[in-house]
Regions:
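PAPS-dependent sulfotransferases, especially Golgi type II membrane carbohydrate sulfotransferases
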Residues: 1-46, 165-243
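Short amphipathic alpha-helical surface micro-motifs
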Residues: 28-33, 77-79, 121-124
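The Walker A (P-loop) glycine that initiates the GxxxxGKT/S ATP-binding motif of P-loop NTPases
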Residues: 50-51
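Walker A (P-loop) phosphate-binding loop of P-loop NTPases
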Residues: 54
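A conserved segment at the C-terminal end of the G1
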Residues: 57-70
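Structural element of the ATP-grasp superfamily
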Residues: 64, 131, 208-209
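PAPS-dependent sulfotransferase catalytic domain
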Residues: 71, 80-202
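Acidic, His- and aromatic-enriched active-site or binding-groove loops in soluble protein domains
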Residues: 73-75
Length: 243
């Protein structure tokens, strides 16, 4: 087994601190704003869209934005429960995305190789646990339901919050607009991103090294059973009443 570099160890420590404090709005959102990490809730925000990384965040953001006939302001991509909590407490509509924990965790470590699988698992828990008490005040969507179910998802948001967001016109043109918005978001980001971990480069898929993915999956399955059960329980709690 290779010995992690000093940079890897520092990156892991930074990730631990970041995820351990990510549910404190005043602290986490101030840090996100300073580092240009995502878009933080403000009084003019129309909706918050958040989720653990690799859970359809970019697609949900772009699908909603592309469908609108008028400009809207979306808080998104901080990957911090603080953004969700701040949105709920401000009375702003909130959409939380969730992906099955094993797939989400493996997706993250494939693009953030300094992280260990167990660290990424703790990050999943630290994202969803603090917002579980707010479950009945938000709309939740599985990541796999975002693309094909965007119209139904926006209708759920409108029904839950009394909003009037436009639903998408599912045409080749609207898909092109959505894809352009995703590309623009990834291209126009500013700031250093996460401490030491930096910015994630957009990848069209997670089809990377099959050996790396297989090792990551094996590490997930050999992680403490109590942690795996907790992540599965969180996923169940957020999705059990979804259509």
């Amino acid at each position: 087994m290779s010995v992690p570099s000093a940079r890897s160890l520092a990156s892991r420590a930074a990730y631990e601190v970041m995820t351990m404090t990510s549910h404190f709005p005043r602290l986490a959102l101030r840090a996100a704003r300073a580092r240009g990490h995502g878009v933080v809730v403000t009084p003019t925000t129309d909706i918050v869209i958040e989720g653990y990384p690799r859970s359809g965040n970019s697609l949900a953001f772009a699908s909603l934005l592309a469908a609108q006939s008028a400009s809207i302001t979306i808080a998104h991509h901080t990957h911090a429960p603080a953004n969700v909590i701040a949105g709920v407490e401000a009375g702003i509509p909130v959409l939380v995305l969730i992906r099955a924990p094993e797939d989400a965790v493996i997706g993250l470590v494939l693009i953030k190789p300094d992280l260990t699988v167990v660290q990424a698992m703790r990050g999943y828990r630290r994202f969803y646990e603090p917002i579980l008490p707010y479950r009945d005040r938000i709309v939740v969507s599985r990541s796999e339901d975002v693309d094909d179910g965007s119209e139904a998802l926006i209708e759920r948001i409108n029904q839950r919050f009394g909003t009037s967001f436009d639903t998408p016109d599912v045409t080749a043109n609207s898909r092109s607009t959505r894809d352009e918005l995703i590309e623009r978001y990834w291209r126009d980001r500013v700031g250093p991103g996460l401490p030491l971990l930096g910015r994630t480069e957009r990848r069209p898929s997670e089809e990377l090294d099959d050996d790396v993915a297989s090792r990551a999956r094996a590490e997930y399955l050999s992680a403490p059973a109590s942690l795996r059960r907790r992540l599965s329980g969180l996923y169940q709690s957020f999705t059990e009443d979804l259509p």
